Amino acid sequence: MNKDNVKLAIAPIGWTNDDMPELGSENTFQQIVSEMALAGFTGSEVGSKYPRDPAVLKPMLDIRGIQICNAWFSTFFANGQREKTIDEFVNHMNFLHAMGANVIGCSEQSGSIQGLDKPILGDAKPCFSEEEWQRVAEGYNTLGRLAAEKGMQVCLHHHMGTGIQTTAEIDKFMSLVDERVFLLFDTGHAWYSEGGEAPMLAILKKYLPRINHVHLKDVRPPVIDQVRRDGLSFLDGVKKGTFTVPGDGVIDFRPVFKLLDDFGYKGWMVVEAEQDPALANPFEYAVKARKYIRETAGI
């Protein structure tokens, strides 16, 4: 891949999980970002342990050569929380802008079961009505406009357990929003939802012109099989090892890197692979991911 076009980041979720704070509670902010830098990454997304004052956070990252590239934002347009979502988005956007980021990754969380004790591979996930889809589209178009006014871009993170998870749901969303709304492509969630590498790559191919942020996440099919068989929740699956870093699971990332490179993708690729840090040492797995990307993507 072209080193001038692509930057590599890693998410803190491998060290400490915001949805399950007991996982990695012993890992401090300074340890996390120091290990990111030591593993060879130059970017990070934002976790719950990160200071939210740019004047405090930025110097602590600068000394380690780390930039903030994104931070998760939950939207609630489908269930009618438009004004509250937009107000909170503006504050979130201003924080990211102050940190030098230009991408804002959002997930539509209305009815989401990703944090609930419900089977993630059952039929409990939300399915939006036409009215709800229109609310979501109108809301995201508003966020896209607000971000553009700041010289930034909004992207939708398709995610297990949400109303925008499957290929069909991604297609529906992308058909309704305007050109100022982009897609955050996540290899692990695409594979998990659609059950294989071919449909995962099909999403990537179809939306290459609209993808402005990439999450690199590998999967362990035997764990996914157990999740399906035992009716486990998303978070129970995470604790058992549904996800891992690139090079440690079943996904061959070389076609992913080639598609992005051939298209001329410019932006961040973020290793975002949540698992139990007591079972998968975060620093060791960060080093493993960095080595794999160096060997397969040439960066």
Swiss-Prot record:
Cofactor: glutathione; Co(2+); Mn(2+)
Reaction catalysis annotation: scyllo-inosose = 3D-3,5/4-trihydroxycyclohexane-1,2-dione + H2O
Protein name as it appears in the record: Inosose dehydratase
Family: Belongs to the IolE/MocC family.
Keyword Transmembrane helix carried by entry: no
EC numbers for this chain: 4.2.1.44
InterPro entries in the record: IolE, IolE/MocC, IolE/XylAMocC-like, Xyl_isomerase-like_sf, Xyl_isomerase-like_TIM-brl
Species, as recorded: Klebsiella pneumoniae (strain 342)
SUPFAM superfamilies: Xylose isomerase-like (SSF51658)
Tree of life domain: Bacteria
HAMAP family hit by this protein: IolE (MF_01672)
GO MF annotation list: manganese ion binding; myo-inosose-2 dehydratase activity
Biological process annotations from GO: inositol catabolic process
Keywords assigned by UniProt, alphabetized: Cobalt, Lyase, Manganese
